[in-house]
């Protein structure tokens, strides 16, 4: 029989109507001779009542056989509940069943189909199709669909053209590791799955599309964490003839639309702007969380004269003040924070507490001569905890930035109902890679340098600034973009600055350089991480919670067992041979 409506949409206006519902058995209760069933579908739960005096013996027997997650079809009359359940949208009504059919049975599930389960992540991913039945997971994916719908409508209104770009593309050496796909037809040659459609979308600007967008899958073979996956989705934009400000205005409008249509929140425009150097100096991060204070303080000059070489001889001494938290952190707690500091390259973590107007702690004796100056500089009050890092400026910033975020979570300083957006602008063009022993692109090698610093491409690369901009939300990089290079000579200079020979640049990017001979317009764009955006809107801490079928932290899928070995014949067709891992060899 045809389904009348979703179970979760039955309301008081349907009282007296005969309807047919289909879904899963959430729970069965036997009470006073009656059987009560919670019928669940994607829209919610509806209570069913099977009364032995009003149904056949066959229907009653079927009802008694029901177990959790059986799939059933029921027909009956909607009635008002004697005692309403205010916790359910359907709580004022119930269905008096007259007919019942079992469409499929189910084994006992490895975890309950409800919110707040304690199953481990791999178990949830192994049975992802069951995990997705849980209401909170279903709501997360429905939110994701609403977000993409809102984005498409907004960009369509602004006359952006949705264009699909290739998944089988060329491997390039910059950025994260590529996922490689061997070519059967062209032996020894490989495609790469795109880390982003960066070059192809730029070529679309050269083709005259003017405004492009795509909600697109991208792939990066990198170490995983809570806000990363090997395959992820981004909202990709590119425009011609627009300024940095105009691109940011479009992006702010997009985010404002999404926030209003999915969360009912009116965001204030324009978003604040913060220079990269200020973000690092004050927050210790290029993606600052501005929902709480605890800014980094530079004490390098203040402590120059103290009789403590760790401070007086350090390139930089910086501190954060944790207001009123002296009693919240024991020496053991601070030892744990010291271990965190070492993970960011710091040699240690110095600290003092303000107790009855005096400084207490391991380094307090070295600071007595500057206590008044220190108290004024840091606006110290009783019960404050001060954490110091003495090292290079980069290490001090990164360490205190990490501790700042950790402490704010521990002390509940963050208002989780806030959505603080901001732009981080005026980025360095290059960043030094210790692993590579050279400067690498901070964003990518197609970013347009600021005109007044472009001459340093042949000089001090640390001084080159980019016309680049990242959009940040609550301490997460939501997206980033830039104006792009459209002049061939400047692009060649950029490649040379990155250490490419002319031959290497032509081998890797010759098609782009050639395109620049044919009237390439000024252009720029941006990409927003859709998974991360939805994660933050949903109040989750891991993007796995807003992706239907994600990978685990080992980049594997416990359900399908991907990645897996393949048949020898498949490898032979690709002219590939797999070397056995030394750790798996037996003597």
Curated annotation (Swiss-Prot):
This is Aspartate--tRNA ligase. Catalyzes the attachment of L-aspartate to tRNA(Asp) in a two-step reaction: L-aspartate is first activated by ATP to form Asp-AMP and then transferred to the acceptor end of tRNA(Asp). L-aspartate binds at residues 174, 220, 443, 484. HAMAP family: Asp_tRNA_synth_type1. GO terms for biological process: aspartyl-tRNA aminoacylation. Belongs to the class-II aminoacyl-tRNA synthetase family. Type 1 subfamily. Its main location: cytoplasm. Coiled coil: none annotated. GO terms for cellular component: cytoplasm. The gene is aspS. It is found in: Cytoplasm. ATP binds at residues 220-222, 229, 477, 529-532. InterPro entries: Aa-tRNA-synt_II (IPR004364), aa-tRNA-synth_II (IPR006195), aa-tRNA-synth_II/BPL/LPL (IPR045864), Asp-tRNA-ligase_1 (IPR004524), Asp-tRNA-ligase_1_N (IPR047089), Asp/Asn-tRNA-synth_IIb (IPR002312), AspRS_core (IPR047090), GAD-like_sf (IPR004115). It comes from the Bacteria. PANTHER family: ASPARTATE--TRNA LIGASE, MITOCHONDRIAL, ASPARTYL/LYSYL-TRNA SYNTHETASE. Its EC number is 6.1.1.12.
């Amino acid at each position: 029989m045809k389904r009348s409506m979703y179970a979760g949409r039955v309301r008081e206006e349907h009282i007296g109507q005969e309807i047919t519902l289909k879904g899963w058995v959430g729970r069965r209760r036997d009470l006073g001779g009656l059987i009560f069933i919670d019928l669940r579908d994607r829209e919610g739960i509806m209570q069913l009542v099977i009364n032995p005096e009003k149904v056949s013996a066959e229907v009653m027997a079927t009802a008694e056989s029901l177990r959790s997650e059986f799939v059933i079809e029921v027909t009956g009359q909607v009635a008002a509940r004697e005692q309403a359940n205010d916790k359910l949208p359907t709580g004022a009504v119930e269905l008096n069943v007259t007919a019942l059919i079992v469409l499929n049975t189910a084994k006992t599930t490895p975890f309950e189909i409800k919110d707040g389960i304690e199953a481990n992540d791999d178990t949830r991913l192994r049975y992802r199709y069951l995990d997705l039945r849980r209401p909170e997971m279903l709501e997360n994916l429905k939110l994701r669909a609403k977000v993409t719908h809102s984005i498409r409508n907004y960009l369509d209104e602004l006359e952006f053209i949705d264009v699909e770009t290739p998944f089988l593309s060329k491997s390039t050496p910059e950025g994260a590791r590529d996922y490689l796909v061997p070519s059967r037809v062209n032996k020894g040659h490989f495609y790469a799955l795109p880390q982003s459609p960066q070059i192809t979308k730029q070529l679309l600007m050269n083709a005259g599309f003017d405004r492009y967008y795509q909600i697109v899958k991208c792939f990066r073979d990198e170490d995983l964490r809570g806000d990363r996956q090997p395959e992820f989705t981004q909202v990709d934009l590119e425009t011609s003839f627009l300024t940095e400000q105009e691109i940011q205005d479009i992006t702010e409008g997009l985010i404002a639309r999404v926030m209003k249509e999915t969360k009912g929140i009116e965001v204030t425009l324009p978003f604040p702007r913060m220079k990269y150097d200020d973000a690092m100096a004050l927050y210790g991060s290029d993606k600052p969380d501005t929902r709480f204070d605890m800014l980094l303080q530079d004490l390098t000059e203040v402590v120059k004269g103290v009789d403590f070489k760790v401070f007086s001889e350090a390139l930089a001494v910086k501190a954060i003040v944790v207001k009123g938290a002296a009693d919240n952190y024991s020496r053991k707690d601070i030892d744990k924070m010291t271990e965190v500091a070492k993970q960011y390259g710091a040699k240690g973590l110095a600290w003092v507490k303000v107790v009855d107007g005096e400084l207490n702690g391991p380094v307090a004796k070295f600071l007595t001569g500057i206590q008044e100056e220190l108290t004024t500089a840091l606006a110290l009050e009783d019960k404050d905890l001060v954490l110091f890092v003495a090292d290079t400026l980069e290490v001090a910033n990164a360490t205190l930035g990490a501790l700042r975020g950790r402490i704010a979570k521990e002390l509940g300083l963050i208002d989780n109902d806030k959505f603080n957006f901001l732009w981080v602008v005026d980025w360095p063009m290059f960043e030094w890679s210790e692993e590579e022993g050279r400067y690498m692109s901070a964003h990518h090698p197609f970013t347009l340098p600021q005109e007044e610093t472009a001459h340093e491409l042949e000089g001090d690369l640390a001084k080159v600034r980019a016309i680049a901009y990242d959009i940040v939300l609550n301490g997460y990089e939501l997206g980033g973009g830039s104006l792009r290079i459209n002049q061939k000579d400047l692009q060649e200079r950029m490649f040379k600055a990155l250490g490419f020979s002319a031959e290497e640049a032509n081998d890797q990017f010759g098609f782009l350089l050639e395109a620049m001979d044919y009237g390439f317009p000024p252009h720029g764009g941006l990409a927003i991480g859709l998974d991360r955006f939805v994660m933050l809107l949903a109040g989750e801490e891991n993007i796995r919670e807003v992706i239907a079928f994600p990978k685990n932290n080992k980049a594997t899928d416990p359900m399908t067992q991907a990645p897996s070995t393949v048949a020898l014949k498949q490898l032979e067709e690709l002219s590939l041979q797999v070397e056995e891992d030394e750790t798996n060899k037996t003597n």
